[in-house]
């Protein structure tokens, strides 16, 4: 399975994308699995990146590296693609989604990479989808 990290440099108090890239490279140094890192450059860019990769059809785990807004954008891009798993790697200011799952290792990148995915409910509204908040 390929791993795609969509990093939002604008999430959180300061840009920590370099730190996240180094951590990703460290975790994958001894793994024989393909990965790619993409940095968002403008609003809704995470949606575009996720959709483009999901549409390829290959098994894919996408990591949303940002806050709740980034997570929502990534979800919008991969929703409906059965080949995609979505993981939240929090780096925003609120990170409300992960607060509903106390005790789970969302902040441990290696645990996310090696972890098993679970199915959760998604909310659909008008012409969009959301995981925990409607923007």
Spans of features found by a protein language model:
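Phosphate- and divalent-cation-binding pockets in alpha/beta enzyme and binding domains
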Residues: 48, 73-74, 96-97
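Catalytic core of DAGKc-family lipid kinases
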Residues: 40, 80-135
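Glycine-rich beta-strand-to-loop/alpha-helix junction loops that act as flexible
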Residues: 9, 65-67, 89-91
